[in-house]
Amino acid sequence: MNRREFMIMGAAGAAMAGRNSLYAAANAGVQPRSDRGIVKRAAPPRNPRPYTGLDWSKVVKVKTTSHGHCMSQWWLEQYLKRGFGLITMSNYYPSAPWCPAAKMTENYYRLHHEHAVMVNGIRKDGPFDWNKIIEPWKHTLDPAAAAKKPAWAAKYPFVEGKKIFKPLPPGVLEAPNAEHHSFRLENGKWAGNLHICSPGSTFASGTFDAHNLSKTFSHGYHYGSGEFWGTAIDRMIEGMLYEDGGGVTINHPSWTKLDRELMLRMLDHDPRVLGIEVIEDSGYNSENYWDWALSTGRQCFGFFVPDWHVENKVFGVNVLCVQEKTVHACLKAYRDGNFYGALNGLDELAFTRIAFDGKTVVAATDKPARFEIITARGVVKEVKGNEVSWTVEKEAYWQGPGYHIFARVKAYAVDGSKEVLFSQPFMLKS
């Protein structure tokens, strides 16, 4: 399954909505925004100074990603080969956690669908017995259409199959996550290019039938969220395992050409919307989105992901910096911004220190590197070696307040490995 196919087949929402009158009729009269049933919990702002209080001499580095699909044992092995210590599979159809991995079987969510779904524009709680639901229209199912998409098809009636994964190796942690899609905008229109992950949340949305092979979409069962994006985010937050850990990520803004104002509205919606993907689908680089958001004065953490492309060297890895290796500590590292990004994540280069004391940004690596300090003004310092420091300049009168706004560190390997590291940003005026 590739993303181009995903968009063409209508799983992004807007395209299918435009050419499917039945779908439009099923959703007529839906209120654009509805926060009913959501209990909002207060949360502090996103941390303006990540890594504060970390004892780098005792830091345990846990490799993971916030957005990586994992559909079989082969996929899982790609993460394990790269040394992942935390698995947070972000699968969809439905957008539901594959956690614990030990429970997952072939056809699992066709037989064990417990979460709510939007049905004819109304949110209905589970469980859903799909064999029983589909039975009245089973004679309309098209085997030829299913044969064209074997990865997403299953013979009706559905039967639970074998386990998908072998047991995780000792010491490898796992936490819930999923990739959610098909949201409404504030005006009720579809945000076809908006995808969201929520590492640490048990929230689930949508159905197994994104390609309508079982005709559930034709009968009013929405394959994705189907709700206003803000309501869906609130549900993700409501499902967090820990109040102080995990969060929401805005996926592949460059690949989907995400509207920048929508990105800002999402960051403003709740501080647990942690940030955006920087290294994303197929190795796309979204540093332009990242620096633009940061230049508005908003803290915005950067995430580094393989998405579907686990066979590439350019992978996208989040390196969590924790004092103890537990699920809670790992998810709290996400919330606090105590992690950095790696382009490859093959241990070819690592940060050994990143800090900001309010005046000076410092960073160090385990091997020589080429460092860049990046602010709202661009690259303000470049140096080679094992460490870098940059003291915030006293602003000249012609520059005005908040001239630099933020600072982040980027480190390039100089040994030919092509590894690149990305610190989280420091907001210079918290």
Regions found by a protein language model. Give the residues of each.
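N-terminal export signals
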Residues: 5-27
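Aromatic-residue hotspot detector
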Residues: 6, 172, 366-368
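Short Asp/Glu-rich motifs
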Residues: 15, 98-99, 260
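Surface-exposed flexible segments
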Residues: 21-23, 214, 293
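Charged catalytic cores and adjacent phosphate/nucleic-acid-binding surfaces used
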Residues: 29-67, 73, 77, 189-201, ...
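A metal-dependent hydrolase metal-coordination microenvironment
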Residues: 43-245, 251, 279-290, 305-308, ...
